[in-house]
Every structure is written in C-alpha cells, then in structure tokens.
Regions:
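Generic alpha-helical structural signal
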Residues: 25-28, 143-147, 165
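Short, conserved alpha-helical segments within structured domains
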Residues: 77, 100, 142, 160-167
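Catalytic core of nucleotide-sugar-dependent glycosyltransferases
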Residues: 121, 134-160
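A broad, low-amplitude sensor of folded, mature protein cores
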Residues: 60, 104, 126, 146, ...
C-alpha cells in the first residue's frame, strides 16, 4: 500500500481475474461520478481447473450498520478504496492470518463508516482454494479470528446469530452458483 502510486487501491489475487477488460475503467468512473471513498461488487468462485464451472456466487448488497454482525461482508477482492482511506482506517493487521480482510473491512465499514457504492455486477472470478478454502481446521481458525476482530474493534455480535447467518449466506451462494449453471 505504501509503495502504490494510484489514488484508488484494489487488490487482485494472483489466481483471480476480472470478468471484463473494462472493470477498472468502470470502477474509476464510479469514483468520479458518485463521490464515494469505496466501491465493491459481486464475485463468483470458479473451479480452479475448469473456470467455466461456477462454485459459489457471492451476491453482495449495500453495506448497512450491523451487516457484519449478521454474517454479511462484501467480497474483499472486489473492494476498491481511495488511498486516503488507509490513512484514516489503517492498513491490514498482520496478526490476522486467516481473516485479515474481514478485520480490515470491519474497520472500514462498521467503525469508520466509509462512504461506499455497491456496484451490482460481478467483476471478479476467484478460483477456489487459498488459505481458508474449505479445510475445516482453517475455517475454524478463521472463525476464531473473526470473533477476535469483533472483540478488538468493540463491535457487539451475537455469536450464534452471526454463524447462523453466515451459514445461510454460504448456502445461498452455492444455490445461486447451481442456478447459474442450469
């Protein structure tokens, strides 16, 4: 982040890709016309070998207060922020091995209430796998870190409600993926 040179910062994982050559142009246009500090969108998980096979469809929505406490989080690879947001919010916390993206976005949206725009379209194809990609131990570790993030950032959460909503969201994502493949 410190060595980046642009006014808008986004991350693209090494194995992932934009759904079109115009994604960055479209995102830049939104920053210009909507006067916001953050833009995020939808994401689809694709099979790591057969990228035509959709595994999960992460449909986002407008961020509202308490979304995070109810199991919602925007897909982190779709998030673009103005550089100055990092000055207000801080960088990613390296003490979060599995859920640094969650903890960071918790600060962005719940603590600092950064003015954002939800782009209602899929802009990223993300290959399955990764550090939290399905291994039960890493999922458990991620969930422990998420609870720690709520506590350290003083955001109240009802554990059982959070995990129930998160599970329902995952089921909906897989159902959307199944319907996309029909």
């Amino acid at each position: 982040i410190e060595i980046s040179t642009g006014k808008i910062i986004g991350f693209l994982n090494s194995d992932d890709y934009y759904t079109s050559a115009y994604v960055l142009e479209h995102v830049a246009q939104i920053f210009e016309t909507e006067n916001v500090d953050a833009v995020y969108a939808d994401l689809i998980y694709v099979d790591e070998i057969n990228t035509a096979r959709v595994v999960r469809y992460w449909k986002s929505k407008k961020v509202e207060l308490l979304n995070f406490s109810c199991g919602f989080i925007p897909p982190h690879p779709t998030l673009f922020l103005r550089r100055e947001v990092y000055g207000r919010v801080g960088n990613f916390n390296p003490n979060y091995r599995f859920s640094g993206d969650f903890e960071f976005m918790l600060r962005v949206f719940e603590i600092h209430k950064v003015h954002s725009f939800y782009l209602d379209e899929t802009i990223i194809k993300m290959r399955t796998g990764g550090a939290t990609g399905g291994n039960l131990v890493s999922i458990k570790d991620q969930n422990i870190e998420i609870l720690r993030a709520f506590k350290e950032n003083k955001v109240e959460v009802v554990k059982y409600l959070y995990f129930t909503c998160k599970a329902i969201n995952r089921i909906k994502q897989r159902l959307r993926a199944f319907l996309c493949m029909l």
